[in-house]
From Swiss-Prot:
It holds the Pfam family Carboxyl_trans. PROSITE patterns: COA_CT_NTER. Acetyl-CoA carboxylase is a heterohexamer composed of biotin carboxyl carrier protein, biotin carboxylase and 2 subunits each of ACCase subunit alpha and ACCase plastid-coded subunit beta (accD). GO terms for cellular component: acetyl-CoA carboxylase complex; chloroplast stroma. A zinc finger (C4-type) spans 228-250. The keyword Chloroplast applies. It comes from the Eukaryota. Its EC number is 2.1.3.15. Zn(2+) binds at C228, C231, C247, C250. One of its GO terms (biological process) is malonyl-CoA biosynthetic process. The gene is accD. Pathway: Lipid metabolism; malonyl-CoA biosynthesis; malonyl-CoA from acetyl-CoA: step 1/1. This is Acetyl-coenzyme A carboxylase carboxyl transferase subunit beta, chloroplastic.
Amino acid sequence: MEKWWFNSMLSNEELEHRCGLSKSMDSLGCPIGNTSGSEDPIINDTDKNIHSWNDSGSYSCSNVDHFLGVRDIWSFISDETFLVRDSNGNSYSVYFDIENHIFEIDNDSSFLSELESSFSSYLNNGSKSDNRYYDCDMYDTKYSWNNHINSCIDSYLRSEISIDSYISSGSDNCSDSYIYSYICSGESISGSDSGSSNIRTDGNGSDIRGRSNDFDINQKYRHLWVQCENCYGLNYKKFFKSKMNICEQCGYHLKMSSSDRIELSIDPGTWDPMDEDMVSIDPIEFHSEEEPYRDRIDSYQRKTGLTEAVQTGIGQLNGIPIAIGVMDFEFMGGSMGSVVGEKITRLIEYATNRSLPVIMVCASGGARMQEGSLSLMQMAKISSALYDYQSNKKLFYVSILTSPTTGGVTASFGMLGDIIIAEPNAYIAFAGKRVIEQTLNKTVPDGSQAAEYSFHKGLFDPIVPRNLLKGVLSELFQLHGFFPLTQN
């Protein structure tokens, strides 16, 4: 006999994610922690407590923290015991064996006793109930047993929590009328859906995150929510921009568009873009089997509203005139082609002639392969312009490395700043993890290319969060002799 602890929640097939229940579920409560294979339940082990529902009479979406749809809860192996606890603290051991038609409950309860009596009646009489929700095919013994279990629980919960019939999916199959959602704390699950759901639990069971099937739901509601790629928490999209694309749950810095970064750094009304009409002409006539290079450029222009993977211009930062270039990873991975290199070079030359400080915000996968050696020469061209700017004119260049900064950008102007600033958690490398592992046939340790690791190796200067970045830049400029045009 194998025992499992379940964090069981009821959800409808139509509302299987984040639904609220309209009535207090006094008879049905929340289970508790993982038994770790022990035969004796540890009811009061707070370290293994997952979640509890409040005793209030109504429930909103916030009361149901985790839903993970499972199409067939009876696909678990037979001869199982699962343990539940109601809102009054009473615990029950429920055992059912589908093959031998056994259903037992170890404690007297109105909810579970009614279920047990229903099953006993079914076993003794071999006939289905008159309830309209029990209308299942009874010709196959195993099929009818499975569906009778489902329909009994379905019917009881309908009456207990006052769920109207219109919520039902309308299917004639009882097993489709409701979906019982389980988050299992066991080491393995036998079932058809268990393989498609990647569930991770921490040591105390308080942080359970489903990754696989949740992505489809998140895509459906991506106009409302932004999912953190670190903790998988959801952030309300309407307020996400005002939070500087920082996850409210874990503080992780998510990617920002170039326009959002300009709005974050530049004083309102002072932004003056440069070379906006400069576009690539496909210099080597690169054509792939999937999509021609020109067509790909056009599609990214429509998608992002940008002409290229970098925006350059002049503006003011806390009243200090600056020249700034911001790369956008959403445009072909921020790859550096001839247009990107030319725009950055012109920006540096303009700043050299006007004696302006330069900021470059890097977010790139490296040189653009569709332009061949012309993209590689941009590294030398930008570095040459920076040499004149820094060494001859003695001006101040700040490089800001965001996630990801790799390839040719890392090998050129990304690492040439007088001050090199990195964002928290930024992925910074010359060759990416996948490229290194495929080339050298060696495993790259996790975190070895993160900003925090590189910082301790002396690769750059400070790690600055976004909410402090503008103030830090302002102090750096004033320290190097660049002051606001108007004193407050």
